[in-house]
Each structure stands twice: as structure tokens, then as C-alpha cells.
Amino acid sequence: MTFKSGFVAILGRPNVGKSTFLNHVMGQKIAIMSDKAQTTRNKIMGIYTTDKEQIVFIDTPGIHKPKTALGDFMVEAAYSTLREVDTVLFMVPADEPRGKGDDMIIERLKAAKVPVILVVNKIDKVHPDQLLAQIDDFRQQMDFKEIVPISALQGNNVSRLVDILSENLEEGFQYFPEDQITDHPERFLVSEMIREKVLMLTREEIPHSVAVVIDSMKRDEETDKVHIRATIMVERDSQKGIIIGKGGSMLKKIGSMARRDIELMLGDKVFLETWVKVKKNWRDKKLDLADFGYNKKEY
């Protein structure tokens, strides 16, 4: 039997549902999610393998007009995938009109010479007439290989989209073992799960100012628990106070919620210790960006 494989990038503006889609396809959490824009900062692979095929999805940071060095890193990480994939899924929301951000991405896609499938997400939020108008508007902007409306949250049409990708795969190698679901190490996934809880529980400027560093992660032979020490980095003392909360209540809540997700992922009991440190303006310092896991050399 012929084995087929290929690489598929998921591109789009922030908050259009790229990570929700990837997690639904994979059947488990690979990429963190929140209602905050620019939640995804790194490229994250989701490796979907059957006995006949392997589709390597690359979830990318939302493309936006960058205002910091971190923003530059995120946008470059997204666009760099155009050089390394066989197909692009360009995801747009059904419930928002086409904007300047979409037009900017479309111009880059036209120049990339890669087959592009338009994925219109969040169809559960709109009337069919609005959906048809949205599809017609985007259809006039460029020549898409396919146009597929979906609801990543509810799963509508997601399997159909995967089938379309499968039909267009070419004969190729199995790049990853069948039990590997992502390219990122466990430490990265743990740091992202902690950051997700910070995003979920805080507001205003804090989400964009947070990075999480895993200081150590090892099994304690006496308790048979995975002992994790993590530092939450922020840019200002006021942000540190908010994350710690009154009497440490917010930090305790972040740790408790993150620990449950980490235990599900690792399949082990976890002892999680968290600290909060201030590193002023880290998002604009390239050395700090690399220390916190945002290194262009890896992309």
C-alpha cells in the first residue's frame, strides 16, 4: 500500500480559531487557546498519522502588524512556513468582514506559489446568507484551490477538510513515528499550559507581557510525582502583583488549573511550583526573547 504525506500550514489573523482547529483534528490539546489575540507565539506542529498517511499541520502565530520585537518574531515565524509546506490553510472568521489584515496575508499568499485552501471558520455564528456573502467576497480576492466552511469549535466539516487534504497528498515518507503528535518537547508544552491559564485568568495588558520559563522538570522517586519549577516572567511590578493576587490567591489558582492539564498530558501526578519575576521590557530585548524560547534560529 502506498504511503502519503505532506506538510500543511495554518495561517490567518489572530483569534480566528487556528489552534482550536488543530486541537480538534488531533483529538487533544496541542496548542493553547484563549480569547486573547496572539495567544500562539511559536510555530507548533500537530502530527496526524493513520496507516495510510501522515499530515504534519503547522499552527502559526496570528499575523498582525507587529509593535515589538516579539511581534516581529511571531509574524516572521508565521510567514516562514510558506517556504516549507505543500499546502496552506488560510483561515478566516465567518462572523467578521474581510479586513486589511486579510488582504495583507492574501498578497503574501499570491506571491508564495503554494496551493491555498480557504477555511471559513465559525460558521455556527452566522446565518447561511452571511456565510455565502463572505465566501463570495474572498473568492474574488484570489484563486483558492478549495473553499471549506467549518466550525472548529463544534467540529462541523472538520473531517471533510482533513479528507480533502488527504486526497491531495502525494506519495512520501513517514517523517515521524506514529505515536508522536507534536515536535515540541514536554517542557515547552508545560510552559504553554501555564501561560494559557495566565491568559485565561488575567485581563488588559498582562497577557501580552507574560512568558513562562520551566526552570526544572524531573521525577521525584520518593513521591513518584513529576516535580516542576516554573517562573512566570512579566514586564512590570504592577503586573507581578496582579498575577500573585491577594495573599497569593491568583498564583495559586493559575498553578492549580495548569497542574490538572499537565497531569492529563503527562499521565502522571505533578507537583508544580511557580514564581513570578519582573524582567522590564523583555518583549523588545532579543537576548531575553531567546532565553524565553522565542529564537529565530529555530525557524
Swiss-Prot record:
Domain annotation Era-type G: ranges: 4-171
Any Pfam family: KH_2
Ranges where the record places region G2: 38-42
Region (G1): 12-19
PROSITE patterns tied to this protein: G_ERA, KH_TYPE_2
Binding site for GTP: 12-19, 59-63, 121-124
UniProt GO molecular function: GTP binding; GTPase activity; ribosomal small subunit binding; small ribosomal subunit rRNA binding
Matching CDD domains: Era (cd04163), KH-II_Era (cd22534)
Chain residue ranges for the region called G4: 121-124
Function: An essential GTPase that binds both GDP and GTP, with rapid nucleotide exchange. Plays a role in 16S rRNA processing and 30S ribosomal subunit biogenesis and possibly also in cell cycle regulation and energy metabolism.
NCBIfam families: era, PRK00089.1, small_GTP
Protein name: GTPase Era
Species annotation: Streptococcus gordonii (strain Challis / ATCC 35105 / BCRC 15272 / CH1 / DL1 / V288)
Gene name linked to the record: era
